[in-house]
């Protein structure tokens, strides 16, 4: 492996153990990503009536996911600034403790409302963990090693995505649904011990001031907007006064947030960053990737478990190709960038993601399962060749001491993109499903029975023999809704591909290309 000369700002002792530190940082990252990937497998179980689950409706499931995501996204900037000011290690340790406590409380939830609240607590902790891991990484690696380290760090996301659904499936096969949250606690304890022992502290010598007004405006605006979108899907009526009013209020508050940030002398988001088209495109497309990914993951669980009849563990195994592809290709994506350039590699990766999203529109109840496996694998290949290069572009666009802010900005767009993906594509799914099943429901059926396939099948179970006639129409209506939703996600992904083709830089210069390729190849041996 190539060993670079330590930067004068990096102590020699820290430089020597930088790869071990990277491993500890990946463990902390693993906890945050693992939780969301585990939850993806558990959403069907949580939607099952008590005592098996909590009987959560589709809109409550969307909020259980988005309560975490919105708090996470809204506090990332403040978390990054606190890390810059107080020290990234201290903030990382505090975030892990809060995340662990939130996980234990979520496991003991007695209702969907409690689960939503405790997921928000978990989001609070995660907001301090995610940016701190990447900020510490940027302060223990030299600039020429950062792409390699970020590639491995991104591969850790793939590892978490790989083991999350499988772990969740194993837990749900043997324990109650709350075990998918309780599993976080021992991992948090292990990470805290290693962090105290190995990870150095770092801070920005000239940190910015906290921006409480900006944080409040961003969180309130996002919550109102997402509420309006989810409510529209729940009612299957986006012209409802409540839906229009809350969505418009959310957009107005977000507009006020942008105006305030431009005028503030200590903004959460430095709007001058977005004058750089490359930086803006990279940040925006990261949001688009997570918009599509979170939406597809949401409906694919119901497709595999409800329509195809697979268990949670089998569903986790079915998702393995998606994660394996990311794990294998993320650390090597930089080689493709060195050869072909960011624009070509990222555009091709995003186009592949769009094609695989569109492929869901041809899946039905008896499609050979190997086709789904190929779709998941190729989607993972596409993600690896988009996320890793874009992460490098974003992190290297700012000085080392601003690493916390760059990481927070990147992760904010991921989380906001994912939240909007769940809200928008979840609402498309709900609206399309209601349109396909409403005429099949018996007279007097509750309005909620048409909100999701799980609600319809629960009604069918209560009706006994009379309800058996609802099963096939429910499956057919869900498949139609999944096809519509997948095509919407594919369209959004294609817009991201076009943006990257236009704005991202092309192939690097020869000298730099050769140097980076030599180091990356050496790292792989």
Regions found by a protein language model. Give the residues of each.
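Hydrophobic transmembrane architecture of multi-pass small-molecule transporters
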Residues: 11, 190, 393, 413-505, ...
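Transmembrane core module of solute transporters
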Residues: 18-71, 176, 213, 227, ...
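Residue-level signature of the transmembrane alpha-helical cores
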Residues: 28, 94-98, 102, 118, ...
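Transmembrane alpha-helical cores of Major Facilitator Superfamily
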Residues: 30, 66, 70, 97, ...
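Hydrophobic/small/kink-forming positions within alpha-helical transmembrane segments
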Residues: 73-74, 104, 162, 219, ...
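Helix-loop-helix hairpins in multi-pass membrane proteins, especially solute transporters
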Residues: 81-214, 218, 312, 366, ...
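C-terminal membrane-cytosol helix-exit motif in multi-pass small-molecule transporters
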Residues: 186-203, 221-230, 249-263, 497-504
């Amino acid at each position: 492996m190539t060993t670079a000369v330590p930067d004068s700002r990096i102590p020699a002792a820290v430089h020597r153990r930088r790869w071990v530190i990277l491993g500890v940082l990946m463990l902390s990252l693993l906890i945050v990503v693992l939780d969301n990937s585990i939850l993806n497998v558990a959403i069907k179980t949580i939607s099952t009536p008590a005592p098996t689950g909590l009987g959560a409706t589709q809109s409550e499931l969307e909020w259980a996911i988005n309560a975490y995501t919105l708090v996470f996204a809204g506090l990332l900037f403040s978390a990054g600034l606190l890390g810059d000011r107080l020290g990234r290690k201290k903030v990382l340790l505090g975030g892990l403790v809060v995340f662990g406590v939130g996980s234990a409380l979520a496991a003991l939830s007695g209702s969907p409302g409690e689960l939503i609240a405790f997921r928000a607590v978990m989001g609070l902790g995660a907001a301090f963990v995610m940016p701190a891991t990447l900020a510490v990484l940027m302060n223990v690696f030299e600039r020429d090693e950062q792409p390699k380290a970020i590639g491995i760090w991104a591969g850790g996301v793939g590892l978490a995505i790989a083991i999350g659904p499988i772990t969740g499936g194993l837990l749900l096969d043997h324990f109650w649904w709350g075990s998918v949250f309780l599993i976080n606690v021992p991992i948090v304890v292990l990470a805290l011990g290693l962090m105290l022992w190995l990870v150095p502290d770092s801070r920005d010598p000239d940190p910015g001031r906290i921006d409480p007004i900006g944080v409040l405006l961003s969180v309130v605006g996002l919550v109102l907007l997402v509420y309006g979108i989810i409510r529209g899907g729940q009612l299957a009526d986006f012209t409802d006064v409540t839906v229009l009013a809350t969505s418009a209020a959310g957009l107005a508050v977000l507009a006020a947030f942008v105006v305030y940030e431009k005028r503030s002398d200590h903004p959460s988001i430095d709007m001058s960053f977005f004058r750089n088209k490359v930086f803006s495109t990279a940040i925006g497309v990261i949001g688009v990737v997570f918009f599509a990914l979170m939406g597809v993951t949401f409906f694919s669980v119901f497709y595999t478990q409800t329509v195809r009849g697979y268990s949670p563990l089998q569903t986790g195994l079915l998702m393995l190709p998606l994660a394996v592809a990311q794990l294998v290709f993320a650390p090597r994506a930089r080689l493709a960038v060195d050869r072909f350039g960011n624009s070509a590699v990222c555009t091709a990766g995003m186009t592949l993601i769009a094609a695989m999203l569109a492929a869901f529109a041809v899946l039905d109840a008896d499609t050979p399962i190997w086709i789904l496996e190929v779709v998941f694998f190729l989607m993972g290949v596409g993600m690896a060749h988009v996320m890793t290069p874009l992460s490098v572009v974003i992190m290297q666009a700012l000085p080392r001491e601003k690493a916390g802010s760059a990481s927070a900005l990147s992760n904010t767009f991921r989380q906001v993109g994912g939240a909007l993906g769940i809200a928008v594509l979840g609402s498309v799914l709900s609206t399309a499903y209601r349109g396909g099943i409403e005429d099949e429901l018996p007279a007097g059926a509750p309005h909620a029975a048409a909100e999701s396939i799980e609600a319809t099948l629960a009604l069918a179970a209560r009706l006994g023999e009379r309800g058996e006639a609802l099963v096939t129409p429910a499956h057919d209506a869900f498949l139609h809704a999944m096809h519509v939703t997948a095509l919407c996600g594919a369209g959004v992904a294609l817009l991201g591909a076009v943006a990257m083709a236009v704005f991202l830089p092309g192939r690097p210069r020869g000298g730099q290309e050769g140097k980076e390729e030599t180091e990356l190849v050496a790292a792989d041996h």
